[in-house]
């Protein structure tokens, strides 16, 4: 039951906030902001500690992580102390931002977090459920790999899907964290994954938006309240990332992006104003943060810098046009901001996969359709499943109102530019045909409109919150001005309370719109095991559940990973010849894969079977014919079915676990 996951979620919250809070203290992040930046810093500590431990050969565990993290925190504190002693002016704990009381965005985050947590629970169906997607076999198998090998390093985790399990880079921030929950709390891999999904969507995402809200100059309290409160009205995040892929690392990365952008907002303000006292603290926090984001998912870094780029350009323009600055001051500040721009462009250019990985997805909409869906948040519709969900008209209207509000006030116009820029990238991915331009613009997101659709939610939430808060504040001002002069103060005081309630009510109602309900239902279908499930149906799960009772721990099961059997490693803790659908089976199994039916006449087959203890073959169904071009690689296995080479051991419907009995006496 969900109640049984409460201790797991509480542990995850402590793990996500505790180490990062300590690092925030070491870096002298202001106390009022520290908790909201803590998760970003925690995931940096988790991923970097895993690399350090992997290099030293020390097994990954909660104790080893805490030990390395403590050393890293102490090193950061020591650096700040040394600099503060030598140059006190560079070690200030005062950061720029706004003067909105923290209670305002926190109150909004409590409501928004609760709504998204409830929505996400409905999306993932249950605490023991798992995503019926091909990529999820990698994510779940990676947790088993970490537990078995004691190595959680991003430098080696790619071995999970490598033919001979040779080390390869794969950003492991998500998997490192899930493995700590799994190994420490004694739960299942599926439940540890679901708990981390709930943490990312329902807690880290609104918390990250609080950090961002407190960084925006001249933001009004009602707007700071509305920004994290309104997130329940946007189903594309987390919904699309939970449905497609499945894209767990992107989910976590996007949840942390607002807090990293908030760091960049503060950094740009410091450089614009020449207030360098907080520069060291901000720069170190940004370096730690970018390490955390990159090791969760590199395109989270690209997403953050794309969002922040208009702000940096606006900062350069302000410095150049300023009449109050001397020429030397302009050059220094412009140079500092120019370095930030170079970093942004470098991230966008270099943090992208190869062309083959980036050129998979086709456009699904016309440019006009894509523009309409962007403006009214019908982002779930641009997919290969041809969904026709209702757009989020309320959220879209509030975002447009927020853009109009900023234009009218001539304030924070860079937020509109960020919204337009990210929206343009989504339109490119959803509507522009394959080619060099499409690759140039959206390759960091694999040209995948799902990833960019989920990213569009971030600027849309900001504008919708600003629009809602600005509208309610304008309504309050209009009412107060029409009250008798002696009663205006009382009307304004009472009205502010009413305005807070109104903002929260509208934010709550936004989560009840048809688009949210339709998306939630569609996502939940992907987490159910039924007789017609697309990756693992009930018969296949029956076979997998019996495997630990039949197959000895040290044996290997011959399989075709495209049929869902790749999940056996994570769910049944037994080794396979193929752990992922893109897995290239090791040449050491060549005779088995191609000549299994000839095991009684071809001695090489039984030699491999006995040498590698590959005494079993599992045959499941590939219901949707995933990877049709790859199926020829497994024809040799299918040809052995019905011969005297194989003996059925357990069956559920047509799904069968076989013993390669022809080799038992060889």
Describe these PLM feature segments.
Residues 1-98:
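Membrane-embedded, hydrophobic transmembrane alpha-helices
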Residues 111-255, 523-534:
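Active-site lumenal/periplasmic loops and adjacent helix-entry segments of GT-C-fold
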Residues 213, 393-420:
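Hydrophobic, aromatic-rich transmembrane alpha-helices
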Residues 38-51, 108-117, 167, 196-316:
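Membrane-embedded helix bundles of polyisoprenyl
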Residues 11, 17, 484, 503-666:
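Extracytoplasmic
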Residues 7, 56-64, 126-132, 239-252, ...:
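Membrane-helix boundary/interfacial segments in multi-pass membrane proteins
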Residues 1-3, 135, 244, 248, ...:
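Transmembrane catalytic cores of multi-pass membrane glycosyltransferases
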Residues 45-48, 116-124, 149, 224-243, ...:
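Membrane-interface helix-loop junctions at the exits of transmembrane helices
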């Amino acid at each position: 039951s969900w109640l049984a996951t409460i201790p797991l979620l509480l542990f995850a919250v402590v793990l996500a906030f505790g180490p990062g809070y300590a690092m925030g203290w070491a870096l002298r992040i202001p106390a009022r902001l520290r908790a909201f930046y803590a998760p970003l810093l925690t995931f940096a500590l988790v991923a970097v500690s895993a690399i350090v431990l992997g290099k030293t050969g020390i097994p990954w565990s909660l104790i080893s992580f805490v030990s390395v993290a403590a050393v890293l925190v102490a090193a950061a504190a020591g650096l700040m102390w040394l600099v503060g002693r030598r140059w006190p002016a560079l070690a200030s704990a005062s950061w720029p931002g706004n003067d909105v009381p923290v209670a305002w965005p926190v109150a909004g985050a409590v409501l928004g977090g609760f709504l998204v947590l409830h929505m996400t629970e409905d999306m993932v169906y249950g605490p023991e459920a798992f995503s019926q997607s091909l990529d999820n076999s990698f994510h779940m198998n990676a947790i088993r790999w970490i537990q078995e090998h004691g190595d959680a390093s991003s430098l080696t985790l790619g071995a999970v899907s490598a033919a001979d399990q040779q080390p390869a880079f794969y950003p492991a921030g998500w998997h490192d964290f899930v493995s700590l929950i799994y190994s420490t709390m004694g739960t299942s891999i599926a439940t540890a994954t679901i708990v981390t999904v709930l943490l990312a969507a329902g807690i880290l995402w609104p918390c990250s938006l609080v950090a961002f809200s407190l960084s925006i100059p001249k933001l009004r309290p009602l707007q700071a309240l509305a920004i994290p409160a309104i997130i329940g009205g946007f189903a594309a995040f987390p919904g699309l990332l939970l449905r497609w892929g499945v894209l767990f690392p992107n989910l976590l990365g996007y949840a942390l992006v607002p807090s990293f952008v908030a760091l960049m907002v503060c950094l740009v303000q410091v450089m614009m104003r020449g207030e360098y006292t907080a520069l060291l603290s901000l720069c170190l926090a940004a370096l730690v943060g970018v390490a955390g984001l990159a090791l969760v998912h590199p395109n989270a870094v690209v997403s953050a810098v794309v969002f922040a780029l208009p702000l940096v350009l606006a900062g350069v323009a302000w410095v150049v046009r300023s009449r109050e600055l001397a020429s030397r001051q302009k050059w220094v500040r412009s140079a500092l901001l120019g370095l930030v721009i170079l970093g942004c462009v470098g991230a966008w250019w270099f943090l992208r996969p190869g062309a083959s990985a980036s050129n998979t997805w086709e456009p699904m909409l016309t440019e006009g359709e894509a523009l309409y869906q962007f403006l009214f948040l019908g982002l779930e519709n641009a997919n290969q499943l041809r969904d026709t969900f209702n757009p989020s008209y309320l959220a879209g209207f509030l975002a447009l109102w927020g853009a109009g509000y900023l234009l009218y006030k001539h304030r924070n116009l860079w937020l509109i530019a960020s919204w337009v820029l990210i929206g343009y990238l989504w339109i490119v991915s959803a509507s522009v045909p394959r080619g060099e331009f499409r690759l140039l613009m959206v390759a960091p997101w694999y040209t995948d409109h799902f990833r960019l659709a989920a990213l569009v939610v971030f600027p849309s939430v900001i504008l919708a919150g600003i629009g809602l808060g600005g509208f309610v504040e304008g309504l309050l001002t209009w009412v107060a001005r029409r009250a008798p002069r002696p009663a205006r103060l009382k009307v304004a005081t009472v009205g502010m309370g009413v305005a807070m309630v109104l903002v929260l009510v509208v934010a709550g109602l936004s989560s009840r719109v048809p688009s949210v309900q339709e998306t939630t239902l569609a996502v939940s279908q992907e987490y159910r095991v039924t007789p017609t499930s697309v990756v693992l149906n009930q018969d296949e799960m029956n076979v997998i559940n019996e495997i630990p009772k039949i197959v000895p721990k040290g044996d290997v099961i011959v399989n075709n990973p495209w049929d869902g059997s790749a999940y056996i490693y994570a769910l049944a803790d037994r080794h396979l010849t193929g752990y992922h659908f893109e897995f290239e089976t090791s040449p050491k199994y060549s005779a088995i894969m191609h000549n299994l039916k000839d095991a009684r006449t071809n001695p090489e087959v039984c030699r491999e079977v006995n040498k590698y203890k590959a005494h079993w073959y599992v045959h499941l169904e590939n219901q949707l014919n995933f990877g049709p071009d790859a199926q020829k690689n497994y024809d040799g296995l299918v040809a052995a079915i019905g011969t005297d080479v194989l003996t059925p051991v357990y069956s559920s419907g047509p799904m069968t676990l076989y013993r390669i009995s022809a080799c038992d006496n060889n």
